[in-house]
């Protein structure tokens, strides 16, 4: 008779050396393997997390909203893309925070590594430096520009991007101001360091926001059936913006 502990240790050793795509396939093999991999704080996920993430990020307060090794790893895989941002932006060693270099008369943007066309997705955006005259968060397709001359609301300036300008509390799309947001009398302005939760519903084709766990309402409806990416655009030199992917939003 095989010792269950021995079987567990063998699986742990094997799964720790597989690629992440292979782990998903393994979870579909049988109930036993599914339950084994469903433990998001197991040594398997710990090993993969520590192997992929920078050490400084694993226990960082930035990842306070993703408490397990598996969700931390998932957040890292969805973070800002160093290959899909303005030349005036770089991604810091923690993997989650972008830094805009102090380049005059330029507006610069960055997209996440992974876009979405199906399902419901949520991520947090934390502006960790000054906003400047324009600071926009939202989504875009791959066709949206990531850099332009001047200090403008780049995100939302064309038909391939949708954004919320945190400085003026305006919604922007196709170069037009779509209205005030949120729809509150004397809506408070964003304070540096606050976490804003972005909620993209690809089933209902809507984009919404939350701040301080308060739902602010649907910002955009009728989004196209295209792959949409988390995006921000910034103008202030040396400002920094972090993004943490959370997964499927919890209702209520």
From Swiss-Prot:
Keyword DNA-binding tagged: no
Coiled-coil region list: none
Cross-referenced Gene3D superfamilies: 1.20.1280.50, 2.60.120.920
Record GO biological process: negative regulation of gene expression; negative regulation of synaptic assembly at neuromuscular junction; neuromuscular synaptic transmission; positive regulation of protein catabolic process; proteasome-mediated ubiquitin-dependent protein catabolic process; protein ubiquitination; synapse assembly involved in innervation
Localization, UniProt: Synapse
Pathway(s): Protein modification; protein ubiquitination
Domain called B30.2/SPRY: residue spans: 58-250
Any GO CC annotation of this UniProt entry: SCF ubiquitin ligase complex
InterPro entries per the UniProt record, alphabetical: B30.2/SPRY, B30.2/SPRY_sf, ConA-like_dom_sf, F-box-like_dom_sf, F-box_dom, FBXO45-Fsn/SPSB_families, SPRY_dom, SPRY_FBXO45
Keyword Coiled coil in annotation: no
Domain of life per record: Eukaryota
F-box domain segment(s): 1-48
Record's keyword terms, sorted: Neurogenesis, Synapse, Ubl conjugation pathway
Sequence similarity: Belongs to the FBXO45/Fsn family.
Assembly and interaction partners: Component of an E3 ubiquitin ligase complex composed of hiw and Fsn.
PANTHER family: F-BOX_SPRY DOMAIN-CONTAINING PROTEIN 1, SPRY DOMAIN CONTAINING SOCS BOX PROTEIN
Described function: Required in the presynaptic motoneuron to down-regulate the levels of wnd and restrain synaptic terminal growth at the neuromuscular junction (NMJ).
Protein name, entry field: F-box/SPRY domain-containing protein 1
Taxonomic classification: Eukaryota, Metazoa, Ecdysozoa, Arthropoda, Hexapoda
């Amino acid at each position: 008779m095989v010792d269950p502990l021995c079987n567990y240790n063998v699986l742990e050793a094997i799964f720790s050396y597989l690629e992440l795509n292979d782990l998903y396939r393994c979870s579909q093999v049988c109930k036993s393997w599914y339950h084994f991999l469903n433990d998001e704080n197991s040594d398997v996920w710990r090993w993969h997390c520590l192997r992929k993430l920078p050490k400084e990020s694993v226990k960082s307060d930035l990842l306070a909203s993703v408490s397990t090794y598996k969700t931390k790893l998932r957040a890292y895989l969805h973070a800002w893309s160093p290959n899909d941002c303005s030349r005036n932006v770089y991604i810091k060693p923690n993997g989650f925070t972008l830094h805009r270099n102090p380049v005059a008369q330029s507006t610069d943007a960055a997209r996440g590594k992974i876009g979405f066309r199906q399902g419901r997705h949520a991520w947090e955006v934390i502006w960790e430096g000054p906003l400047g005259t324009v600071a926009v968060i939202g989504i875009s397709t791959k066709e949206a520009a990531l850099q332009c001359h001047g200090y403008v609301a780049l995100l939302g300036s064309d038909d391939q991007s949708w954004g919320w300008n945190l400085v003026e509390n305006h919604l922007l799309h196709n170069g037009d101001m779509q209205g005030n947001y949120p729809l509150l009398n004397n809506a408070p302005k964003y304070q540096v360091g606050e976490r804003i939760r972005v909620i993209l519903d690809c089933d209902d084709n809507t984009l919404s926001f939350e701040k301080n766990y308060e739902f602010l309402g649907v910002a955009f409806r009728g989004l196209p059936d295209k792959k949409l990416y988390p995006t921000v655009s910034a103008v202030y030199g040396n400002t920094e913006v972090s993004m943490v992917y959370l997964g499927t939003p919890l209702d209520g």
